[in-house]
């Protein structure tokens, strides 16, 4: 069967994979019903494009990274998400991709971005599931009997900072900091992407993001000599570009305000810096470190940081 699936005269395998990769980057596939691609599915919006990408994918040796590079370097992917009146009139659902779709990044990627930019992310590949920071309360209601009780054994050391791919996932409940994740009690082909106050509260208060902000603040403090350079470096690490327009002034203003807050409240500074298992550099003054931590946490929560624009 495997040989049959990958024979040159069997085009469906390549088309299905190409369509799913397209869905990953654009929010929906060239064939909208990615779970049912065939004679009963929706018709492709761009049939020739689907066929061409499928042939390219097959002839590249089924290399997924090559396919992804082809998609993300295309003019279609790199165009603006700004919607004009003409777009809304002629193609309100953007089926023809006259502009880029605007998507919130999946929570797994948001967590990995925070860990990567701060320098906490563990590069280890493979191994058993890990147990990153999670509140205990969601698990208590799942204990049917004492014998089947489950306590969450939080990981230690580098395992706390593994990629989200390796996070332990119980069938009846998804990790609570993974927004819109399926509970896996039913099969879901696509994850719904929503935006709610609960998501914002999580990213502002969850130890994962607070600790990442603290470590990022520590990192840029060591790497750069001035406030301006530190803020620019943190901005670039989180958003992948240099701050522009009014952004440098706004960041500097926030840092100044946070300095005043934590200079007047040493206990609040120490409490903020105590979040997370990683050790902080005590040579950095607490009020200064806390102020830059709060600023870095704001960077992680910017719309531009959580949205693919």
Model-derived regions, located:
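Active-site Gly/Thr loop motif
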Residues: 163, 172-182
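Short, surface-exposed polybasic-aromatic patches that bind anionic ligands, especially phosphate groups
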Residues: 295
